């Protein structure tokens, strides 16, 4: 179950139901979206659900270190040919307007994953596309790649970054497992 879910829990004792429910809802409402699974064994005991009433769980939002943001902004502004690579995390974060403002501010072309289509207006002059030779050409010419909301993993990122060792790559993602 762990391979198909964000989190998996097994309730081994009835008195642990509230603990597992809180953890499951915390995982649902925090970070990268994904399914959670709670396994409940055969009902061998009883549990009084009024003994520990459910309290709504507030999700958390990750935030980068402000000094890292300043350093990344400085690198982005100094780049000669920056490129923004967008993943589905931009959609999950409802950050499309902020992405558009950033791209326009630094005049950086934008490419996206298939799952991020729509995160940046496809009729915008800075939008390059998802795949194809033109995307490869922009990647090749870039001196800085700002990857936002994308894991850059080979299964999701259809283009390798040519000459990656000679480029500055800034990777911004809420899921630390994808950095």
Language model region names:
Residues 1-19, 115-179:
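Glycine-rich, acidic loop regions that bind phosphate or pyrophosphate groups
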Residues 15-19, 29, 88-95:
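Active-site glycine- and acidic-residue-rich loops that bind
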Residues 23, 27-78:
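Conformationally flexible catalytic loops at phosphate/diphosphate-handling active centers
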Residues 25-27, 53-54, 96-107, 159-165:
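Short, solvent-exposed amphipathic alpha-helical segments in soluble enzyme
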Residues 37-39, 107-114, 170-173:
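Short internal beta-strands
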Residues 40-45, 88-90, 176:
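Glycine-rich beta-alpha junction loops
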Residues 47-53, 94-98, 121-126, 156-160:
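Short acidic, glycine/serine/threonine-rich loops at helix termini
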Residues 64, 71-145:
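Anionic-ligand anchoring segments at beta-strand to alpha-helix junctions in alpha/beta enzyme folds, i.e.
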């Amino acid at each position: 179950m762990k391979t198909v879910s964000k989190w998996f829990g097994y309730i081994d004792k009835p008195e642990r139901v509230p603990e597992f429910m809180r953890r499951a809802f915390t995982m649902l409402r925090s970070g990268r979206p994904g399914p959670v699974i709670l396994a409940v064994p055969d009902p061998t005991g009883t549990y009084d659900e009024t003994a520990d009433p459910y309290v709504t769980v507030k999700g958390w939002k990750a935030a980068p270190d402000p000094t890292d943001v300043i350093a990344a902004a400085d690198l982005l502004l100094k780049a000669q040919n920056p490129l923004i690579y967008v993943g589905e995390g931009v959609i999950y974060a409802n950050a499309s307007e902020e992405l558009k403002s950033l791209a326009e501010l630094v005049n950086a072309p934008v490419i996206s994953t298939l799952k991020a289509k729509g995160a940046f207006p496809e009729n915008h002059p800075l939008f390059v596309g998802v795949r194809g030779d033109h995307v490869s050409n922009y990647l090749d010419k870039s001196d800085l790649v700002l990857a936002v909301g994308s894991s850059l993993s080979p299964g999701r990122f259809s283009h390798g970054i040519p000459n990656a060792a000679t480029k500055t790559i800034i990777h911004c993602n809420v899921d630390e497992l994808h950095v």
